[in-house]
Curated annotation (Swiss-Prot):
Belongs to the universal ribosomal protein uL5 family. The keyword Ribosomal protein applies. Part of the 50S ribosomal subunit; contacts the 5S rRNA and probably tRNA. Forms a bridge to the 30S subunit in the 70S ribosome. GO terms for biological process: translation. Pfam families: Ribosomal_L5, Ribosomal_L5_C. It comes from Thermoplasma volcanium (strain ATCC 51530 / DSM 4299 / JCM 9571 / NBRC 15438 / GSS1). This is Large ribosomal subunit protein uL5. Gene3D superfamilies: 3.30.1440.10. Keywords: Ribonucleoprotein, Ribosomal protein, RNA-binding, rRNA-binding, tRNA-binding. GO terms for molecular function: rRNA binding; structural constituent of ribosome; tRNA binding.
């Protein structure tokens, strides 16, 4: 295979959606910082929802974006929690994978802290090819990536099975 067609991990995004600002949000940020070692950023509400008492641009969650070695290390920890099994429906048609972890205490070495409580999280794995993806991100001369270069679902499944020993449950 051409080395520019090789699939690599672009980023791993870890998200905790709290749904409200305040004390629970700071606790969720503390959990993410303990797990990843990076300072999380707040996610804001896109629109107001009266039933949930959420206003537009109100912080309602925290997330951390991990790249390169940090992404691979955290992904190994997260897949260990899931017993290296991901369901087939977790992959989208562009080769990205998403799964949830119900409790942060499932991670190796993490103990329950009654001051923090229980927080689950969503993990998103974004894959890309080594070459060719810059044309979609650059400022001048942007173009869409041809479908022949885009990562297919089957290629993403094969990448995770080969590199992380993940079994995809169908």
């Amino acid at each position: 295979m051409n080395q520019m067609q090789e699939i690599i991990i672009d980023k791993v995004v870890v998200n905790i959606g709290v749904g409200q600002a305040g004390d629970r949000l700071t606790k969720a940020a503390k959990v993410l910082e303990m797990l990843t070692g990076h300072k999380p950023t707040q996610t804001l509400a896109k629109k107001s929802v009266r039933d949930f008492n959420i206003r537009k641009r109100l912080p309602i969650g925290v997330k951390v974006t991990l790249r390169k070695d940090d992404a691979v290390n955290f992904l190994n920890k997260a897949l260990y929690v899931k017993d290296y099994k991901i369901p087939d429906y977790s992959f989208d048609k562009h080769g990205n994978a998403y799964f949830g972890i119900s409790d942060y205490t499932d991670f190796k070495g993490m103990k329950y802290d009654p001051d923090i409580g229980i927080f689950g999280m969503d993990v998103a794995i974004v894959l890309k090819r080594r070459g060719g993806y810059r044309i979609e991100k650059r400022k001048i001369g942007k173009k869409t990536i041809p479908s022949s270069i885009r990562i297919k679902k089957d290629e993403a499944v094969e990448f995770l099975e080969k590199n992380f020993k993940v079994s995809v449950v169908r």
